[in-house]
Amino acid sequence: MKIGLFSDTFYPEINGVATSILSLHRELTRRGHEVHVFAPKCRGWEDNQQDTFHYITSAPFLVLKDRNFAFPGPITNWEATKLDFDIVHTNSEFVMGYFGKHIAKSNDSVLIHTYHTIWEEYTYYITHGVADEAARKVARKYSQWWCNRFDRIVCPTGKTAGLLYDYGVRAPMEIIPSGMDIARFAPERHDALERTARRNECGVQPGERVLLNIGRIAKEKNIEQIMRVLPRLLQVHPDVRFVIVGEGPMREHLTKMARELGVADHVTFTGPKLWEIIDQYYAMGDVFVSASRSETQGLTYIEAMASGLCVCAVNDSCLDGVIQDGVSGILTDEDDESLLQGLIRAFSEEGKHIAAHAAEYAAPFGTEAFAIKMEQCYEKAIAEAKK
């Protein structure tokens, strides 16, 4: 099949959507398909390796300045149209999503969409708390309108599918968890020398244990809650250092918060890191933590498990079938006290036992299974379109 993937975020950006698309591109290509990606060009980024990555001129998005807004022009339109895709698979509800729909219409391609992001959790960036409920209703209505115009909708989890059904989406839906390259995160691939080098880079002192968070530093990721409980965690485990890998609009606020709480000496912000070496940052950790409730799947949880870390996460339906409390990770309730107790457990003997077996529970989320399921989804959609 000839497949076009369209997205408003892609490599070298580090987030779940970009990782999912990169994994899908690589695995489908390995399986003999011709796969092209169309996405915004990141500032300062030049790609000389891959002629199936089509980077489009872009500018920083007005609201989310760490994201890019693409401007697909006539040349890009010609390039995409002449490829005559069997499948157009959009991964965005905005600029590149519309561009993908336009290309699909031009070539009469089958149109698939993956709903990666629960947009009602992101309205704060526009409203800043003013009339936010009205904005959330608009986000729900827009998602319904958008998804009902596709041949098939792919949902990373049952949580997402249930949410879209509640919105009123009646297009055929399939639940297909995004896959990841499990092998590259395997603990045995990272030796002590590499681990020590990364820990030194992040200011980790000898004898300190690393509490790790990787991803976009944004309000919806709820890193504030982790920072709030950090002073009390340090009373129990004074050897902990909180390392935050990534970049985003909340970094300055969290830096100030760490100072005000008196924990700045135990917190490191690394800034953004390339996807090719992100596994090395997982490898230097001891416990991975997330308090986000806005995930559709949460690939970082699986990456952390594949890296042999104990994951401590605020419970969310996106984790159904991924983390079982006390077995493959530690799940907590939403309140601060519950998160604190979960982190104390994670740094105890229980956490060490969970970490020792974590990689086994990440194994089913590999890229091959993901690509096979997507391949079957495409074939089914093509067959139905011919009826």
Residue ranges of predicted features:
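Conserved acidic donor-binding segment of nucleotide-sugar-dependent glycosyltransferases
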Residues: Q324-D336, R345-E350
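Short alpha-helical donor nucleotide-sugar binding micro-motif in glycosyltransferases
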Residues: C147, P272-K273, Q280-G285
